[in-house]
Structures are given as structure tokens and as C-alpha cells.
């Protein structure tokens, strides 16, 4: 299995760190000459930074084929995957031998900042245990969006030091990580400008041409669309960007559906740090806060959905009808979600969108949605509206 290392270490019995400064050179030499030696150890055997020696992939596959053991190895790595040259050292895909897990920054439930009173799994099963209180006020959500779900920051006392972690991460992206992904030196200053532009475009279906135009709105833009595309692709490879795919349901009408992905950072704190914003800035600009909060909800919903063997997409058609998130499971069940900061007017807007989209779905060709839900930032508790059955749930009450 391929896990991010902090989580992988909790499930191992033995470990080897390929990038240990004292043994790194020896480890890489061993990987080239006698790689099976690196696999020796009590199972599960964790191999950290495996991408530095990708030839281990085939050695592990061979071992699994002959031992028929399950859960024998855990491969963990940093955000930087093998480059194209290293990928050529892998001869077999490993289908049927390896399971992949995408590790993201922590959700509010994982960091202990959601009560977990409302289970996404229960909603799909028709169980609506609502009424649970949410621990967070709007000020809390502004802080949590800026702090992000980084494990180190989540364990720190609330304050400037915890908020600083996201800024340090953005610095590392611009100065090092975006160039390390494929050993192509990229401009740190342009990377910062690009991150800032992408932060302004969170939750939109912006094409590369739109991103380039935004980049040139404040200062001369000497980079081509192709260069912008390459930088964006590099950010995806290091798991900074995780765009949300479009949902294409069966509809009764013939309105064309937009199929462009929605732009999101993997964590809202990347957006706030790129823009140089703190919690007070978000509270003073609720429009911007709304986009940042949408990124936070997208992060959490993705993790919650994957725990249920599901995924998250978005909907938008040519008429302008748009749904922020569609959570769908492998069995064909799905739920429609709108994201709002809160307040009666915004909640009503979300309800109107959900009911309109639900009414457009062709129920002869697909099932009706398991639930309609407005996820909010503020709100003391979750509830189901008696007049239409729409669930209103603060993000601080949600769990898988």
C-alpha cells in the first residue's frame, strides 16, 4: 500500500528510511545491486521515500506473487512522486498487488474540530440522526481555514505559530517542490504569482487562458499559456492542486452540461497563505471567505466520501444551474450538496439550487438523490427542514 509517511508509520512493525542522511547512499546502492535485502524485516515492513528507488516496486511485486501475503509492505513517500526517468525503472503496474490511498491534510473530524454528530454514511443509509451541536463559530472556521489541516499545525496551540505553517508550506512549494517534481528548474516568483491567481479562482472552472489573463492583470505577463499549463500540471503532481471533476447525470431536459473541472487547492490554507490572508481578513471579506470555505468543505467531503468508497464531483450546466458538490458511491447512490457560510438568505439560495437540480434528474434512468444538504460554516446544530426535507448541517458536525 502507498501511504503518506506519518500515517503509515502507525501501522508498521519494521521500517527503513531510504533518505536517512547516514545511510541514504548505501540504501540506494543496495537498491541497485541487491534490492531484496531492503525488504528484510518484520511485516508490515515500511519503506519510506520509496520513490527514490522505484525499482523496489517490481521487487515487492515479485515477493508478493510468491509469498501470497497480504499487507506485507507499506510504501510511503513525500509529495514528490518519481519523475519520468525513474518511472521507467518500474516494469509492472502492480495491478492486484498494490492498493493506493491518497492522503490529504486532516479533516475537521480528524483534527477533533467536528463533533461528528452527522454521519455521511448514515445519510446514505436513510438514517438522519440530526440535531447534534457544532463546536465552531464563524470566527473558528476562519481560523481553521487559515491554519489548514496540516498535522503539525493541528497539534499546536492556537496562535501565530500554527498559522505560520501554511506560509512555510507555500514557501517550500515555490522555492523547491515545484522544481523537484521532474528536475526542471521553475521560477519561484512566477510560482508565487500563479498560486495567488489560483487562490483568487478557487471554486471556478477557469481555463488556463483565464489563469494567464488573471496573472497579467496586475503586472506584465511574459509567460505563455503552455508554460502556465506546465506549472499547473506540476502543482497537481505534488498534490497542491486537486481539481474536482464534473458530474454528468441523466436529465429530463437537453441542457448541455459543462464538463470542465473546478479548481481547488488540496487545503484552504494554501489559498489564504498565497494571498497573505489571516482569519481577520476573511471575517472582513465574507465573499472571499465563502470561496475559501468552499475549498475547506471540498477537502473534507472528499475524505469522508472515500471512506465510503465514494467520490465527489460538481455540476454546472449551460443555463447557469450549479451544484457545489455531488457525493456519489459505487452503488449508484448520490447526494447533492450546496456550500454556504450560513444565514437564512444564503441557506435559502442553496435549498433553491438543490431542489431545482433534483427536479431536473430523470428518475426513469437513475435513482433520486439520497439526500439534499446545505453545508454551512455557522450554525449551532444540524436539522432537517420540514417543508422540503433538505438537511442543513454545519461542517463542524459532519463525519464519514
Predicted feature locations:
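P-loop NTPase Walker A phosphate-binding motif
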Residues: 1-13
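Short glycine-rich substrate-engagement loop in P-loop NTPases that contacts/grips substrate
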Residues: 13-44
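Active-site ExK catalytic segment of metal-dependent nucleases
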Residues: 17, 334-345
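Conserved P-loop NTPase "ATPase switch" module shared by AAA+ and STAND
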Residues: 39-56
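Conserved catalytic/switch belt of AAA+ P-loop NTPases
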Residues: 57-81
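Interdomain motor-coupling "hinge/lid" segment immediately C-terminal to the ATP-binding subdomain
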Residues: 83-204
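Accessory nucleic acid-recognition modules appended to NTPase machines
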Residues: 158-333
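Domain-level recognition of nuclease-like catalytic cores that cleave nucleotide substrates
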Residues: 375-400
Amino acid at each position: 500500500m502507498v501511504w503518506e509517511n506519518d500515517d503509515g508509520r502507525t501501522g508498521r512493525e519494521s521500517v527503513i528510511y531510504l533518505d536517512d542522511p547516514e545511510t541514504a547512499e548505501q540504501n540506494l546502492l543496495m537498491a541497485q545491486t541487491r534490492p531484496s535485502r531492503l525488504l528484510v524485516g518484520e511485516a508490515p515492513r515500511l519503506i519510506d521515500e520509496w520513490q527514490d528507488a522505484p525499482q523496489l516496486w517490481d521487487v515487492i511485486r515479485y515477493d508478493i506473487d510468491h509469498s501470497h501475503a497480504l499487507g506485507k509492505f507499506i510504501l510511503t513517500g513525500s509529495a514528490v512522486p518519481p519523475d519520468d526517468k525513474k518511472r521507467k525503472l518500474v516494469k509492472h503496474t502492480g495491478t492486484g498487488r498494490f492498493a493506493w490511498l491518497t492522503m490529504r491534510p486532516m479533516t475537521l473530524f480528524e483534527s477533533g474540530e467536528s463533533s461528528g454528530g452527522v454521519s455521511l454514511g448514515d445519510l446514505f443509509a436513510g438514517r438522519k440522526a440530526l440535531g447534534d451541536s457544532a463546536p465552531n463559530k464563524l470566527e473558528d472556521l476562519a481560523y481553521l481555514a487559515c491554519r489548514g489541516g496540516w498535522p503539525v499545525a493541528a497539534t499546536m496551540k492556537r496562535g501565530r505559530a500554527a498559522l505560520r505553517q501554511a506560509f512555510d508550506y507555500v514557501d517550500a512549494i515555490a522555492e523547491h517542490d515545484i522544481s523537484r517534481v521532474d528536475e526542471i528548474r521553475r521560477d519561484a516568483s512566477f510560482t508565487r504569482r500563479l498560486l495567488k491567481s489560483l487562490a483568487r479562482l478557487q471554486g471556478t472552472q477557469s481555463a488556463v487562458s483565464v489563469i494567464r489573463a488573471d496573472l497579467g492583470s496586475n503586472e506584465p505577463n511574459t509567460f505563455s499559456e503552455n508554460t502556465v499549463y506546465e506549472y499547473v500540471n506540476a502543482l497537481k503532481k505534488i498534490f497542491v492542486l486537486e481539481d474536482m471533476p464534473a458530474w454528468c447525470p441523466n436529465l429530463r431536459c437537453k441542457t448541455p452540461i459543462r464538463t470542465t473541472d473546478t479548481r481547488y487547492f488540496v487545503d484552504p490554507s494554501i489559498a489564504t497563505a498565497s494571498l497573505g490572508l489571516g482569519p481577520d481578513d476573511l471575517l472582513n471579506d465574507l465573499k472571499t471567505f465563502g470561496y475559501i470555505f468552499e475549498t475547506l468543505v471540498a477537502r473534507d467531503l472528499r475524505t469522508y466520501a472515500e471512506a465510503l468508497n465514494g467520490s465527489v464531483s460538481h455540476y454546472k450546466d449551460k443555463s447557469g444551474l450549479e451544484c457545489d458538490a455531488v457525493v456519489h458511491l459505487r452503488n449508484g447512490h448520490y447526494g447533492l450538496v450546496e456550500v454556504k457560510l450560513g444565514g437564512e438568505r444564503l441557506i435559502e439560495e442553496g435549498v433553491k439550487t438543490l431542489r431545482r437540480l433534483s427536479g431536473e434528474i430523470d428518475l426513469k434512468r437513475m435513482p433520486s438523490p439520497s439526500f439534499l444538504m446545505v453545508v454551512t460554516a455557522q450554525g449551532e446544530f444540524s436539522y432537517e427542514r420540514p417543508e422540503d426535507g433538505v438537511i442543513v448541517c454545519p461542517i463542524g458536525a459532519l463525519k464519514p
